[in-house]
Amino acid sequence: QGTDLQAGVSSDQIAARVLGRETQLASLELAIDGRDFVGSCDDGFSCAYTNTISWANDTTPLPMENNPRVVFERLFGDSGSTDPTVRKARLAKDASLLDSVTERADDLSRQLGTGDRRKLTQYLDAVRDVERRIQMAEAQSDRELPVVEQPAGVPGTFGEHAQLMFDLMALAYETDLTRVTTFMMGREITGRTYSEIGVPDAHHPISHHQKDPAKLAKLTKINQYHCELFAKFVERLSNTPDGDGTLLDHSMIVYGAGMADSNAHASQNLPILLAGGVAGIGGRHIMYPEDTPLANLQLSLLDKLGVPTESLGHAT
């Protein structure tokens, strides 16, 4: 509780450790809600548990970015353009800055004690990761990219915001800038409203519906809205050529929620949807035995991705 964190590496980051070796960005973590919550959020537990679903290790939650402009800059740089000439100039400038940082760090290292030198080593490891990404980007800089305008910022409605984030995810896959993304459409205990679909009430209070028909109807509207936006993303992937098929053919997509019954805070029998050619045979509804951990499914999916993993969470 409090500021003490104890979770576990998430399946997306296990995949990123392997699949991310060949791309500019190992992974991309996205969200709709901001990171305005700090301290204790739910029953005295850290807000880190509700602000993200991606964990690098037991104690390191990864921040999820909700600003489309920042996501665009992570993918294509701050030049605001996907033009190859502009991108090359920006990469050369970034590489020059990193060379300067490394030289100064080497000089500083000789003047530090053991403890400070260890901290500097950690910092330099992060610098080398940035350097690796720049080198990867330089190798790919001649590639023709779709002409895309840099987003101005966060759109005004949930639907526009979610659609833009899904589009950026699809663009990241299409350009092979990353092969692993995680998108949290709604944080736990969210107070978001959905006036554009006729639901002005906050999401979290509605989820504790106590079987009130009016609240259930509104909750159903929200769930349908989320699914419709997700379906558009899947459709876009299915319409995007990729090698001998489409992006959807070569993708594995997992869509779901952390609760099956929000009114009772029940996390058993979670509804999980799989899409994409890598996810296996579609068009099926599979009922797992009672108390089967979700981690069992995640281990199977990692294996299909070519990332065999011995254990994960409470997998049996």
Kindly label every feature range from the protein language model:
Residues 1-316:
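Ligand-binding pockets and gating/stacking loops
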